[in-house]
């Protein structure tokens, strides 16, 4: 059973979404925590020490014994864990249900856009409130939490199975988001389908769609592909995106973008999520042969440094990175674990978002992409 955590003075509802720029959904201010009634957060150093004690007790155990002991420790903590995340409930719900059934530990779940979840954790930390034990959001937002010392260092053998781009000291990737060019097959013939970004940007003026929040996709293509591989100047590459936007509609949300392409309202979308196109495989939607290179960006899961439940938190993180991987693969996502053969085909050429560099240059790339979006001259569709 998925329950909702009452983290603020007014509790979130099951379908609440409060994202801000960069999350792919609408902006809304995070509610204010009342520190007089909120549960007191643990000191980060104490939380890390408690987690280290748990991992030390697990050392040397085989996977089954490790899981069994973690369950025992989690139940001793009270058998509950609070989980904040940005993955839609249709995808993450089966993971939560299976976790509760397999472990006997109940989850309080709050779901919103990645930036909203991040801001909520920042705000709760400032208020000294232990709202979330485990967080799972996009890589760029995970790096911000890490930079604020709001994630605990993870020591788990499961990290060895996670793709290299999704391994960090304090978070790991449960899945990878792959940005692909998708088109409506009723409106775009196989001969007309784009074979390059340049064709996608220039051949579908008036019927092209772009996502309003994909500054990381944009930054990666400009820096690594158009400049790094094709030899353009940065100014030339940015101008190419602006020219594309001048003949495009701008949409907020990849789910909506995929739905509108399938409905025939747009011929081509420049940056759909791969798992969304997989869900529309029976409809007039295609993305193959793929426009390459495909930009990939890890999603992350980690333990919040204010947790008072280290064993339950580690149990949930490890479950998401093992048993939970098949559930994510079943809904078309590309698992972070190399032990699961699913998601984006291996023979597709990819380039990864350089999260560390992007974090240093975030203001620059967000500003440039805002200029691209403004070049469309139209209101954002949402």
PLM feature segments, named:
Residues 8-25:
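Bacterial lipoprotein signal-peptidase II cleavage site
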């Amino acid at each position: 059973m998925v329950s909702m955590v009452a983290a603020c003075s007014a509790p979130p509802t099951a379908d609440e979404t409060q994202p801000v720029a960069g999350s792919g959904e609408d902006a809304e201010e995070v509610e204010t925590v009342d520190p007089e009634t909120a549960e007191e957060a643990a000191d980060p150093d104490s939380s890390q020490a408690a987690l280290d004690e748990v991992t030390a007790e697990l050392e040397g155990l085989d996977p089954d014994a490790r899981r069994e002991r973690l369950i025992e420790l989690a139940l001793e903590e009270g058998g509950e864990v609070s989980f904040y995340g940005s993955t839609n409930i249709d995808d993450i719900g089966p993971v939560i249900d299976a976790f509760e059934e397999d472990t006997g530990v109940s989850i309080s779940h709050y779901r919103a856009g990645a930036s909203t979840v991040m801001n909520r954790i920042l705000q709760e930390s400032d208020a000294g409130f232990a709202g979330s034990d485990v967080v799972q959001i996009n890589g760029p937002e995970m790096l911000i939490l890490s930079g604020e010392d709001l994630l605990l260092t993870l020591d788990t053998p499961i990290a060895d199975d996670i793709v290299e781009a999704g391994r960090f000291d304090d978070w790991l990737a449960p899945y990878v988001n792959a940005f692909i060019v998708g088109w409506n097959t009723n409106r775009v013939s196989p001969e007309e389908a784009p074979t390059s970004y340049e064709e996608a940007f220039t051949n579908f003026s008036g019927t092209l769609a772009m996502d309003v929040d994909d500054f990381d996709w944009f930054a990666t293509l400009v820096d690594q592909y158009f400049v790094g591989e094709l030899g353009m100047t940065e100014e030339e590459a940015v101008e190419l995106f602006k020219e594309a936007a001048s003949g495009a509609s701008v949409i907020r949300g990849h789910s909506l973008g995929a739905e509108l392409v399938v409905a025939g309202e747009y011929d081509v979308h420049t940056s759909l999520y791969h798992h969304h196109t997989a869900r529309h495989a029976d409809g007039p939607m295609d993305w193959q042969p793929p426009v390459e290179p495909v930009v990939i960006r890890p999603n992350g899961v980690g333990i919040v440094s204010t947790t008072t439940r280290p064993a339950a938190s580690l149990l949930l993180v490890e479950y998401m990175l093992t048993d939970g991987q098949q559930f994510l693969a079943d809904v078309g996502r590309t698992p972070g674990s190399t032990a699961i053969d699913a998601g984006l085909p291996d023979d597709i050429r990819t380039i990864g978002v350089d999260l560390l560099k992007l974090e240093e240059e975030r203001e620059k790339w967000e500003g440039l992409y805002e200029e691209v979006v403004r070049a469309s001259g139209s209101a954002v569709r949402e």
